[in-house]
Amino acid sequence: MAHKKAGGSSRNGRDSESKRLGVKVYGGQAINAGGIIVRQRGTRMHAGENVGMGKDHTLFALVDGHVKFATKGADKKHLVIVVPAAA
């Protein structure tokens, strides 16, 4: 009788789910207080005026306004700022 031995199982074939990181609201766009601006790993971008940082380094707006991106210092750190909407 013809037989075929069982093949070994592959060690590959897995992949982690994407984390959907990145900029969620771009420069000049309006944002409400509490809205997420950037999801990131580590502080690639830093919180500027009217911007808070979550424990996973997510940047979010503290006030209603418009998002602005800037650089700061000699090492050109990326800064995220929310310019408050006129009251």
From Swiss-Prot:
GO biological process, one term: translation
GO MF annotation terms: structural constituent of ribosome
Domain of life (superkingdom): Bacteria
UniProt KW keywords: Ribonucleoprotein, Ribosomal protein
InterPro entries found in the cross-reference section: Ribosomal_bL27 (IPR001684), Ribosomal_bL27_CS (IPR018261)
Pfam families: Ribosomal_L27
Positions of the UniProt region annotated as Disordered: 1-21
Record-linked Gene3D superfamilies: 2.40.50.100
A GO cellular component annotation in the UniProt record: cytosolic large ribosomal subunit
PANTHER family: LARGE RIBOSOMAL SUBUNIT PROTEIN BL27M, RIBOSOMAL PROTEIN L27
Similarity field: Belongs to the bacterial ribosomal protein bL27 family.
NCBIfam families assigned: L27 (TIGR00062)
HAMAP family found in the cross-reference section: Ribosomal_bL27
Entry protein name: Large ribosomal subunit protein bL27
Organism: Burkholderia cenocepacia (strain HI2424)
